[in-house]
């Protein structure tokens, strides 16, 4: 594919040098880790039984109240 492109443009090696990709080590501001204001909570793991109960609840209501989540988690 590059040979066809180079032959069509007639620029030879100059065409390849103009198509440089950014350096893989370059960090953009949005890529830098953010300092957390506080500690993040860890991921909650559920047993098979709890997962089954949650799935049954989600069939009726996809948004559980805090109280209902606590009941299901016991």
From Swiss-Prot:
Matching InterPro entries: Antp_homeobox_TF, HD, Homeobox_antennapedia, Homeobox_Antennapedia_CS, Homeodomain-like_sf
Stretches with biased composition (Low complexity): 1-24
Residue range(s) of DNA binding per entry: 39-74
Gene Ontology CC entries for this record: nucleus
Localization per Swiss-Prot or TrEMBL: Nucleus
The organism's place on the tree of life at top rank: Eukaryota
An annotated Gene Ontology molecular function: DNA-binding transcription factor activity
Function: Sequence-specific transcription factor which is part of a developmental regulatory system that provides cells with specific positional identities on the anterior-posterior axis.
Family indicated by similarity: Belongs to the Antp homeobox family.
Name listed for the protein in its UniProt record: Homeobox protein Hox-B8
Source taxonomy: Eukaryota, Metazoa, Chordata, Craniata, Vertebrata
Gene: HOXB8
